[in-house]
Amino acid sequence: MESFIASIRLVAATMLICVAGYSAAVWAVGQVLMPGSAQGSLIAAADGKVIGSSQVAQNFTEPRYFWPRPSAVDYNGAGAGGSNKSPTSTDIADRARETVARYGATAENPLPAELAAASGAGLDPHISERGALYQAARVAQARGLPQAGVEALIHEHAFAPGAFLAPDRLVNVLELNLALDRVETAG
């Protein structure tokens, strides 16, 4: 009986260390090293109301906003993941054709591939700088802003995430759209 009680104590201590201790340690490291990411990278409006996260794509459909990559999960964070459809699926081809048509792409002005294809998780908040520049004319016209000013804002918000590992510069769509709203409000 004594060894049974000792084993119960050992199981309880192990669970306490592995469950509570490990979780607390990971939480503490996250708070110290990456406090913004550990809190969800939330973005708040001027009134303090949370309007999104810089790590999760939102579905912008109005012409006055930059559009993110298509989402296989309809921008639902709870259902994050790619499509289970085969690359030869007619559904995927149909969705790509609809996206190309929505952008008004032509043979002379082809749509960057990323803007027609969903990311692996379906919630990628970034598009390439090239993808944003592709949309600049539409956004500028819809907002009544000079295209050069919209392009300058894109360049201002572009960043290189991994230096030589990911040479393409990226733009966070939500942050860029919020910056456009601020420019329009200030103008």
Swiss-Prot record:
Localization in the cell: Cell inner membrane
Lipid metabolism recorded as keyword: no
Lipid bilayer topology: Single-pass membrane protein
Record keyword Cell membrane present: yes
Taxonomic source organism: Parvibaculum lavamentivorans (strain DS-1 / DSM 13023 / NCIMB 13966)
UniProt-recorded Gene Ontology molecular function terms: ATP binding; P-type potassium transmembrane transporter activity
UniProt lineage: Bacteria, Pseudomonadati, Pseudomonadota, Alphaproteobacteria, Hyphomicrobiales
Position of the signal peptide: none
Family per similarity comment: Belongs to the KdpC family.
Protein name: Potassium-transporting ATPase KdpC subunit
PANTHER family membership: POTASSIUM-TRANSPORTING ATPASE C CHAIN, POTASSIUM-TRANSPORTING ATPASE KDPC SUBUNIT
Transmembrane stretches, start-end: 10-30
InterPro entries given in the database record: KdpC
Assembly and oligomerization: The system is composed of three essential subunits: KdpA, KdpB and KdpC.
Function description: Part of the high-affinity ATP-driven potassium transport (or Kdp) system, which catalyzes the hydrolysis of ATP coupled with the electrogenic transport of potassium into the cytoplasm. This subunit acts as a catalytic chaperone that increases the ATP-binding affinity of the ATP-hydrolyzing subunit KdpB by the formation of a transient KdpB/KdpC/ATP ternary complex.
Source organism, top-level taxon: Bacteria
Keyword terms of this UniProt record: ATP-binding, Cell inner membrane, Cell membrane, Ion transport, Membrane, Nucleotide-binding, Potassium, Potassium transport, Transmembrane, Transmembrane helix, Transport
GO cellular component, one term: plasma membrane
